[in-house]
Amino acid sequence: MCRHTHIGFVQGSDTFWSKSNYVAGITHNVLGYATQLTESDFVGLHLFYMDSGDMDVTTVEQPNGFGETFSVTGLSLRGIYTKILTDRLKIGFSIKYLREQIYTTYMQSFVVDIGSNFDTGIYGMVLGMSVSNFGPQVEYKGEGLEIVVDSDLDPDEKLSRITEKFSLPLTFRLGVKNDIIGPNSEFMNMGDMHKLTFAMDGINALDYTVYGTMGLEYTWNNMASVRMGTHLGHDTAGMSFGFGLDYNRIVLDYAFVNYDVLD
């Protein structure tokens, strides 16, 4: 579902933090904050940081390293605005700063994401849509592209390689959500005690094949949740499982995703 309009469901203010241990020692870290300005206006900040962990710097002459290390890092900082247009339609957009660094080489840019969330009124179906990474082409720069040359070629005895510009992966996402059981369900209304939600997304990133995700979440008494889902058409990701606890506005979530050959 559309992430840009999620803050339109905030009551008051919310803070979110998440850490994911990925393959090969890579970590994904997320920090978010959202607040309601008026009955129909919401703003938020979202920080994502990826760190590969330290790796040895190697050369052809010293393939086992020589004591120096480097890391690959990725940073995404978004400012988000969401507007409730009607009781069924929310729209949102974000301005995002991106930076990726490999040792002493980096690329950075500003891009825009847009999205919407629409309650169809048809059997409780809610549709979400987003388009991400509208922006200019980017290229890598930095000291890592410099090579040492003879002073006859350059007085500073170094030249910088010119890298080719490329487009960021424009990504289209379309999702649907339905409360099969719950206070808003068109099928089985059991109050707030039991809630079962089905969600499915289709994702089309221009640098990858089309794939999808689908899952179920059962929530008991608005306090404890269990979840399961799967990826469709993804080359490595498979089933996922998770649970959540919500007590006095403090929420704890845990999830496990099977990446098959990457285990």
Segments from the language model and where they lie:
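Subset of outer-membrane beta-barrel
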Residues: 1-263
